[in-house]
Amino acid sequence: MMIGIYIAALVIGYLFGSIPFGLILTKIAGTQDLRSIGSGNIGATNVLRTGRKGLAAATLLLDALKGTAAVIVAAYLASGTDAIAANAAMLAALGAFLGHLFPVWLKFKGGKGVAVYIGVLIGLFWPAAVVFCIMWLATAFTSRYSSLSALVASFVTPIFLWWFGHDSLASLFAVLTLLLFWMHRENIKRLQAGTESKIGQKK
């Protein structure tokens, strides 16, 4: 029974996470295919390169909310003890993150996961999401690099969770952080080379 609940939570999370809001919104708005501009990414940072700040903000919000929704829905549907619901929520978070990174509808070529990372953090332990956002904003303000801001904030997150005794969440977000770093591997190379685009700069 528990295995079935956990598999369902993972699938629910994946389906939520695989909704490509950036692509949907830009198509509705009549802009060019998001995958053909900038980094080719379907996330909010690349949407911003279309010059449509409102669309970028909407993409960021909806991508975060799909992560939060996946966690809440999975926890609600899970029956049994609080521990089962908590485990289901964490599996849904993992599923949502993987769904955004590797959506089946887009031949497994999705986004880099920053907004979804924030969204699942909100659903699982919102104070950590506040810390993430503070670290992101502080790094962005000083460096103007969106990618570096995400890397710094995600690196701090599992440490923060572990420090405050949330070992299971710390382990989960350590995995998500490793995945996020992997998805940003080209950004890391460009940061090292000094060729990474800054916030608001078109590629």
Curated annotation (Swiss-Prot):
The chain crosses the membrane at residues 5-25, 55-75, 84-104, 118-138, 159-179. InterPro entries: G3P_acylTferase_PlsY. One of its GO terms (molecular function) is acyl-phosphate glycerol-3-phosphate acyltransferase activity. Its main location: membrane. SMART domains: G3P_acyltransf. It is found in: Cell inner membrane. Its EC number is 2.3.1.275. Keywords: Cell inner membrane, Cell membrane, Lipid biosynthesis, Lipid metabolism, Membrane, Phospholipid biosynthesis, Phospholipid metabolism, Transferase, Transmembrane, Transmembrane helix. One of its GO terms (cellular component) is plasma membrane. It is a multi-pass membrane protein. GO terms for biological process: phospholipid biosynthetic process. It catalyses: an acyl phosphate + sn-glycerol 3-phosphate = a 1-acyl-sn-glycero-3-phosphate + phosphate. Pfam families: G3P_acyltransf. Pathway: Lipid metabolism; phospholipid metabolism. PANTHER family: GLYCEROL-3-PHOSPHATE ACYLTRANSFERASE-RELATED, INNER MEMBRANE PROTEIN YGIH. Belongs to the PlsY family. Probably interacts with PlsX. Catalyzes the transfer of an acyl group from acyl-phosphate (acyl-PO(4)) to glycerol-3-phosphate (G3P) to form lysophosphatidic acid (LPA). This enzyme utilizes acyl-phosphate as fatty acyl donor, but not acyl-CoA or acyl-ACP. NCBIfam families: glycerol-3-phosphate 1-O-acyltransferase PlsY. This is Glycerol-3-phosphate acyltransferase. It comes from Rhodopseudomonas palustris (strain TIE-1). The gene is plsY.
